[in-house]
Amino acid sequence: MPEEGFIAVAGGRVWYRSVGEGGVPVLCLHGGPGFTHNYLEPLEDLADRRRVILYDQLGCGRSDRPSDTSLWTVPHFVEELVTVRDALGLDRLHLFGSSWGGMLAMQYLLDHQPPLESLILCGSPASMPRWIKECNELRAQLPPGDQEILDRHEAAGWTACPEYQGALVTFYRRHVCRMDPWPAGLERSFTEAGYDVYHTMNGPSEFTVTGNFKDWDVTDRLGEIRVPTLILGGEHDEARPSHMRDMHERIPNSEMVVFEDASHLCFYEKREEFMARVNDFIDGVEARAGISRNS
C-alpha cells in the first residue's frame, strides 16, 4: 500500500507519498516552482521495481501554504530537500527532477555534494537567462493574435485575466504538453498549484520571468556534477534540445535522450519509451556500482 504523510520543514509541513518497495529509491522533484506532484504521477510506473517518492514542495498541493513570500527562494527549497531526505532516511538515492525540480536538484548537488547514485533531469535548464531567451524565441512563433494578447496584457499588468491565460495555453499546448485532452494529473497540478510561489520566483509566465530566480545560472559549474546523469527532454520542449545538449557536453558521465514529437512533459507523450529509458539507465548505474536489486 502507498505510504503518505507530512514532514516538518522550515515554514510548515510538506506532504509526501511513497509507492513501491525495495531497491534504491527514486525521489522525484516537481516543477513550477509551485506546480505540485500530481503531474508526476506517471513516474509511479517505476515503482514495480523500486520505491518511488513524490512530495509537494511547501506552498502548493497538499503541503502547507504559508503567507510569508520571503520563503520562496532557491536556498529555501534546497534546505527543504535536505530535510525531506533526512526525514525519510534516504541514505542511497536516485534523484529525479522535472523542469524547476531539476534546477533544484542541481543546486542541491552543487551546494552540498551529497551522496547520490544518479541524477535524472527532465526538461531542466541550467540557465534561466538562456531559458528566457529561448522561450521568447518560441513565443515569437505563436499566432499573431496570441502574441498581441500577451503583449497588451503584459504592458497593462493584467496577466491574471482569462484572455491572457488563454493565450498562454496556446504556448503550453505546443511546448509543455501536446496531448489533447491534457492528462488528469496535469489538470490537477494546474488546479492545486501554488501560484504565489510561481509568481514570486518566476513571474507571470514561462517567457516573462521577473521573479527572484530570473538570473539563476549554474552553467559554469556543471562540470562539478560527478554523479551519473541522464538528461531527458522532448523535440518541442520549452527547455530546448540545444540547451540540454550543451548541458550534456559539460556534465561528465552524462547521457542524453530527446524524444521525437514530444515536449516538456515527454513522460506523458512517450510514456512507455520514457520509463524504459529511465529503468535502463538506473539498472546500468546500479550494475556498475555493484548494487543488487534488493539493496
Regions found by a protein language model. Name each.
Residues 254-295:
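Catalytic active-site module of serine/aspartate enzymes centered on a nucleophile-bearing elbow/loop
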Residues 57-100, 276:
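Active-site loop/oxyanion-hole signature of alpha/beta-hydrolase fold enzymes
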